[in-house]
From Swiss-Prot:
It catalyses: O-phospho-L-seryl-[protein] + H2O = L-seryl-[protein] + phosphate; O-phospho-L-threonyl-[protein] + H2O = L-threonyl-[protein] + phosphate. GO terms for biological process: signal transduction. It is a peripheral membrane protein. It is an enzyme of class 3 (hydrolase). Serine and threonine phosphatase. Binds 2 magnesium or manganese ions per subunit. SMART domains: PP2C_SIG (SM00331), PP2Cc (SM00332). Its main location: membrane. Residues 23-298 form the PPM-type phosphatase domain. This is Protein phosphatase 2C 1. It comes from Paramecium tetraurelia. Its EC number is 3.1.3.16. Its cofactor is Mg(2+); Mn(2+). GO terms for molecular function: metal ion binding; protein serine/threonine phosphatase activity.
Amino acid sequence: MGPYLSQPKRDKTTTTGQGKSVIFAASEMQGWRNTMEDAHIHRPDIIQDVSVFGVFDGHGGREVAQFVEKHFVDELLKNKNFKEQKFEEALKETFLKMDELLLTPEGQKELNQYKATDTDESYAGCTANVALIYKNTLYVANAGDSRSVLCRNNTNHDMSVDHKPDNPEEKSRIERAGGFVSDGRVNGNLNLSRALGDLEYKRDNKLRSNEQLIIALPDVKKTELTPQDKFILMGCDGVFETLNHQELLKQVNSTIGQAQVTEELLKKAAEDLLDQLLAPDTSQGTGCDNMTTILVYLRR
């Protein structure tokens, strides 16, 4: 059996909500893929003045993405730096904490409960792209190739950069760890250089966590929000395959326009976007992945 269905699953699961400073819609669609391996979080006002959103694109199974979806916010709230409003460090530490939890006996047991097939959980992992909004500051922590794009003055202000093995800095680390990059893949296998999980690539006891073949340490980008900032578009890589960032923002803006933004309007914008991105067939390979997007409208 190949990676694709004979017909796509177009049904969408969409959640909407709002907080003091945001309105959001999170929508996911399995599409042409045999299984759904994406997960996401949406937590407006987890504490006063803080909202958190995240997308997790699984590979090698759905289990790590589901694990992170369940545990990320709880671990972030427990984090000492989070409590001291040191959000950049808190995000980094929470990404690394996910790997720590996955390595525990309890974590391994939970992964097995999530598994859809009898696969080796050591090769399961997920990307993580998490946006934290604190008052007028936006932080985006990223490991992998999911993305966040801020619509600023109706143009794209990119809040993350993909972590690919061919990137010179990433490639140097991989080679220092004893690995190689072939066809854009770590050891010829994984097409990401940073991810949560993927524990088989993180087993060299002589190396620190940020020196392994694959690392969970995210980049964190920070920006001060202005009245010109309209919304954040978050998504797994399947959302970004066929249209560039400016085209994606234009598509969302064509739905919400200058109207009073509501949960229902954002729901329509998110679902319409996924419909447009879905390929009519699998011949080209793009528009065929699982798709998850979160639209976070900023109340200014």
